[in-house]
Amino acid sequence: MARSEARRQAREKRPRAVPEERALRERRQPRPRREPLESGAGDHRRPPQASAGAAGHASFMRRLVDQEDAGGQSQEPEVLGRTGNLPRKPASRNSPEAPPLDGTLGCWATGAGAAGGFGGAQNRACVAPTSCPGNLPARPLPFLPPLLASRNPCPWHYVHLSGSHDTLVPTCFEAKLHQKGSGPTPSATSTLAERASPAMATYTYTSRPRALPCQRRRYRDDLMQQPEEPVHYGNIMYDRRVIRGNTYALQSVPLPGQPDPVEIQRQQQARRRAFARKQAQEQLRPRTPEPVEGRKHVDVQTELYLEEIADRIVEVDMECQTDAFLDKPPTPLFIPAKTGKDVATEILEGELFDFDLEVKPMLEVLVGKTIEQSLLEVMEEEELANLRASQYAYEELRNIELAEVQRLEEQERRHREEKERRKQQQWQVVHKHNETSQKIAARAFAQRYLADLLPSVFDSLRDGGYFYDPVERDIEIGFLPWLMNEVDKTMESSMVGRTVLDMLIREVVERRLNLYEQKEGRHASVRPENGLGGPGGTREPLVGFESQDQGASQAQRPLPDRDSLQRTPYDARYAERVSSQERRLAEENDELTEMRKSSKREELSQ
């Protein structure tokens, strides 16, 4: 039931235009034409006819597709397969056509191609009808959706009538058979709208030859009369939209060496961008500035080796001096030309006018005008005086107001300064209060922390010798050094006494030894002389006494003994030790004094 309803709707939507189709066939029959054709009007070529019956059908079953490549625009018939998809169109003009997928031409359901004469061995072009009549533009519009035929694989089923986009006329004699075999399919118009997709950017068109609307008269009035305006006729022999060459074996796939139109368009766009970039770089490249007024640029050779310029232009210098500027002569007075004739006559006094009658009105006017002018001047002076008075009053008011404003500004400034000063004082009070509270807290913390620390510190300092007895320190500093000095003096005096005693004892012993030796020598000399004393005997005691005196003098000299030699370095070391102890005691005393002062300050602060 649903299938029959869909068939009925499809039959109702399909237009019944069989008489129009017959009229179209009759118009498509080849006949001589005398009217000029518009460019693009004859954009269909009929393929060779296999039979007389196929001439009317194969003449308008063709669609021309415009493709633009590097060489220009070309048109090829588009072959539609059984699946209804558009194959890829070749870019060349003369290329063989690929046969259908099943190897047969014409209608697969009715056999119209082979039996009915729609497409034989010589008529291989089978295209889907188009629905866009008119002339082809210079470039195909990529945004126009392609117009495809119905879902039936036969391209002879429907064709668009001229001037209609939605009217399809069945052209196959067995179109009903296809309708039955296709099942519940929508009409060709709805199928055309469904199959149209923006992704397939192929522009298709078709147009019938028609006579141009000629406004000229058929015959000229005068043989020598020139036409008012030239008439441009279109020659289809040079029209790019007309296919050239063999159309019997067009291929649906491009040749291996044929470039892709999309790739060609992309290369052209890249070439345009590169050219535009190069032009921009040329414009941005630094060039020689233009010459100043009165000069011009001259080409100069910059090669390594100079060459003679044969075609040198002969230049000639010429001079021209103008006269000095002269003063402008005075402009003559303008004297207008006379327009009448001069006539002389004699006029006596009192003949032309009465003085009293003529002068009195003029005098009244002059006097009245003078009085009026004087009154105006007086009024103006009064007005100026009033303006000055009002201006003076305004200035006084303004000065008073300015003084008041200054007073108020000064008062505001004083208030602001007082406010800032009060804020500063309050901030200082708050700051001092915070500082005092922090000090009190720190003091309390220090007291609690030092409560147990001070005794231990004092004990350790006392144990280390930093706290000492003043009496003991006075004894160590004042008494002990004096005692040591006195002891040293006493010991030194005793050492000196001992040394003197030793020297005296030595001297006495030496004298006695000398006397003893002299006595023995005297006894030895007396014995050989038989006890006779001579002059030698009398002189020897003198010699002995001299030697004795020398020995005594030598014995009287203080000789350094071992004790004196040992006592000298001992005394130096002792003095150095005593001085170091004194310095240490002085430093300890200073430290103790500082600690006492700090403790007193803390007690006062508490």
UniProtKB/Swiss-Prot annotation:
- Region annotation (Disordered) maps to 1-103, 520-606
Q: Give the principal location in a single coarse category.
A: cytoplasm
**Sites of Phosphothreonine modification:** 331
Task: Tell me which domain of life the UniProt entry assigns to the organism this sequence originates from.
Answer: Eukaryota
| Recorded coiled-coil stretches | 393-429, 572-604
What is annotated about its quaternary structure and interactions? Component of the axonemal radial spoke 1 (RS1) and 2 (RS2) complexes, at least composed of spoke head proteins RSPH1, RSPH3, RSPH9 and the cilia-specific component RSPH4A or sperm-specific component RSPH6A, spoke stalk proteins RSPH14, DNAJB13, DYDC1, ROPN1L and NME5, and the RS1 complex-specific anchor protein IQUB. Interacts with IQUB. Interacts with phosphorylated MAPK1. Interacts with MEK1. Interacts with PKA regulatory subunits PRKAR1A and PRKAR1B. Interacts with RSPH1. Interacts with RSPH4A. Interacts with RSPH6A. Interacts with RSPH9. Interacts with LRRC23.
Q: What is this protein called?
A: Radial spoke head protein 3 homolog
The organism of origin for this protein: Bos taurus
What's the encoding gene here? Answer: RSPH3
